[in-house]
Amino acid sequence: MYNIEVNVISTGSTGNAIFLDGQVLVDCGVPFSKLAESGVVDRVKYIYLTHQHRDHINVATLKKILTNRPTVRIIYPQYLVNFFADCFSYDCSFLIQKSFISSITKWYKIGNITFSCVPLHHDVPNVAWKIHFSTPQGIYKVIYATDTASMDGVIAKDYNLYLIEANYDKEDMVQRIKEKRMTGQYIYEDRVLKTHLSKQKADDFIYENIGRNGAYMYLHGHEDKKDNE
């Protein structure tokens, strides 16, 4: 189905990590052991990061990867620089040496990959990654976008693979909020509506952009939380 390897190691609030083309890890929000079990640690060359939430960046995992694989490059937007400086205030030199800091909307080339990031709409700065792989069959275009209230301003015409958040069904979510308000429960879903993408919006984006040979995968499905969480 795909011209490149696509391995969804984990997606959702418990952790996000997707391995592409046997070399690219997009987000690193899972334990090191999970990546090791998936065979990623020995193969990964580049790690693309989106935003600071811990289900997308597991700092301990990232540090262990860099310790075990010193040639790995970490690619992330400028706004994560301060986040990493805070995390590794005692010593972030090991990260700086392996960092590739990407400016929003600017295109770069590294190895057989051309890539760019575009802003999304979350409660912290966040981006979607557009990653183009040069393969023997031609250019294979992937867009990865999660944790966003909308896809406004994002265009990805005729991409080969759309990895897009479809966190909830809007009608179901609105009904759930109404029921919780009536019973006085904590409404976690209020935040979800403002920070995550509905299946309806995901479908709209995909259908507006996908071509004849495109494929898509839904990511980051909503998980109901208990009132005390």
Show where each model-derived region lies.
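Conserved beta-strand hairpin/beta-sheet module of binuclear metal-dependent hydrolase folds
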Residues: 1-39, 127-147, 161
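Metal-dependent catalytic neighborhoods of phosphoester/phosphodiester hydrolases
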Residues: 58-68, 83-88, 226-229
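Structural motif
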Residues: 24, 45-48, 113, 140-142, ...
